[in-house]
């Protein structure tokens, strides 16, 4: 089972590296959104630090949404999705592997460029650490929850708008607790409670969403 997950993840990474725009477009979008705020409201360190939580996570939500649509769509169009359903491993395992690969290509780069965010938004070390921790816990949850919307709309020709309407309301709890943790860190307060809730959301998403995604994919294919 682990070898099957590794095989699917490796396949997804190889395909993505052949189409590097799929990797860099969400990343550039994230950087551009972050950069626009200091340019628009002025380079006032105290103001930027105060609104940094909202800036980072709104940009992260939008960049995640930008990359979601292709999660299953290409496989659906070329017939690979049906072949995956015939693999001698449960479909939820294949789904987990694809979502993990999606996070490695979209969520992990956001974490790696977080030091740049600290410079652009005038974050101190504790606030930056909270940003990193919320991104590490929260971005995989975005991928798992977003994959449900992709699976439901994979058979539609122009499902981008519907995907946004389905997914964005489900992202709101993650946005609330992630920004709350960053705000608490900027004030020198503890934010273990917010991280615990985000961790519970991630565990719930890993446990439950693969089955919902698999059911939605079977409906879409049939």
PLM ranges: what are they?
Residues 1-26:
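Aromatic- and glycine-rich beta-strand/loop motifs that create alpha-glucan
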Residues 20-42, 58-60, 166, 170-177, ...:
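Hydrophobic alpha-helical transmembrane segments of multi-pass membrane transport/permease proteins
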Residues 96-121, 141, 145, 178-179:
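Hydrophobic alpha-helical transmembrane segments that constitute the membrane-spanning cores
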Residues 129, 134-168, 218-222:
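A structural motif at transmembrane helix-loop-helix junctions in multipass membrane proteins
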């Amino acid at each position: 089972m682990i070898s099957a997950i590794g095989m699917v993840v490796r396949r997804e990474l190889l395909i993505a590296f052949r189409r590097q725009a799929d990797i860099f477009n969400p990343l550039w979008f994230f950087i551009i959104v972050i950069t626009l705020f200091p340019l628009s409201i002025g380079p006032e360190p105290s103001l930027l630090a105060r609104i940094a939580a909202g800036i980072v996570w709104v940009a992260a939500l939008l960049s995640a949404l930008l990359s979601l649509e292709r999660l299953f769509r290409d496989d659906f169009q070329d017939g690979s999705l049906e072949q995956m359903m015939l693999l001698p491993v449960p479909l939820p395992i294949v789904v987990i592997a694809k979502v993990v690969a999606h996070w490695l290509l979209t969520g992990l780069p956001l974490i790696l460029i977080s030091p740049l965010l600290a410079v652009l938004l005038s974050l101190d070390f504790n606030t930056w650490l909270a940003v990193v921790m919320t991104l590490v816990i929260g971005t995989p949850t975005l991928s798992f929850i977003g994959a449900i919307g992709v699976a439901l709309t994979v058979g539609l020709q122009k499902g981008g708008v519907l995907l946004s309407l389905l997914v964005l309301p489900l992202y709101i709890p993650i946005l609330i607790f992630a920004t709350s943790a960053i705000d608490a860190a900027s004030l020198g307060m503890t934010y273990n409670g917010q991280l615990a809730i985000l961790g519970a959301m991630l565990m719930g998403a890993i446990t439950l969403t693969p089955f919902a995604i698999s059911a939605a994919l079977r409906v879409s294919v049939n």
